[in-house]
Amino acid sequence: DKYQLTLKEMYAQKGWSRESVYRFVAETYRACRPDVVVTQDVNGEYGHGAHRAAADAAQAAIALAADEKYQEKMTHSEPWQVKKLYLHLYEQNPVKMDWRKPLAAFGGQTAFDLASRAFECHISQQRTDYHVEDFGPYDNSKFGLAYSAVGEDVQKDDFFENLE
């Protein structure tokens, strides 16, 4: 994670074609049928190339997954329309999540508690200065609605707003 790659360099270094990555993500959308997708910052937070590629592919794959004409290269042939896409740190249509609210479904633990525990399992990150934080330049509670098929958010604190 110490290295910084442009989006073009990331695809080239891994030997990935954008088309194959977009197709893979579009197939994943069709297979899993998410209403909401939440992903990385388009600038890779601190410049992380894989984060940039994730955000790039997440955006491009929405149209492909929904396109009935985009069948010949897809394993999952039923089109799927993702309803909303949120990007971390995206400045348009901002949303601020409250990760400190206790969740009854998780015995009163907060989303922040769970994220912190999950981050501890990300072994390669334990040798870095990165932490789970809901403040500062990489505030993990800040997102923006980059795409919506169901209208803009009004409450600005709920990824599932406007979904039935």
Mark where each language-model region is.
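Active-site beta-strand->loop->alpha-helix modules in alpha/beta enzyme cores, enriched
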Residues: D1-Q71
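The feature marks non-catalytic terminal segments
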Residues: L64-E164
